Amino acid sequence: MPSLDWEKVDEELSKIVVKETPFVLIARVKVKPGEVENYLKIAEEVDKAVEKSEPGMLFHNFDSDPSNELKFIWTEIYKNDDALIFHINNPPVGEYVEKHFELAESIEIEIYGKLATETIDTISQVWGSANIPFKHFKTTNVGYYRNSIFL
């Protein structure tokens, strides 16, 4: 009977588990002066489209910074890696991003939680080509999520 390479089995299992783990994305936006109302319109449009078309988006919210009227924060919770890739490729999101660059000075994206290496590579390429700064805060493995809610 051949022996199993348990290290390799463990590595492959962790890839599957990582791709199916919920995580948080924060996008920090700074709108150009005089464009706040226009920006709020495109934010509302994309929010409605995401709600209708993305079941893997578990939470999607756009908040204003209390200390700066030009700054806003998207808070998004994704069911898994595939939900993020779907979001990036969703046509209404693409339209929003195009309009964003007309109405805003900047956007910076932060992700908190586990992501598969292939997902990080994909989003680094997509956001890098659009000059969108991205930072992945890797988990320390201290923390949890409730399977009953997310899976």
Located regions from the model:
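Short S/T/G/P-rich N-terminal loop/turn motif that feeds into the first structured element of a domain
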Residues: 1-72, 79-89, 103-151
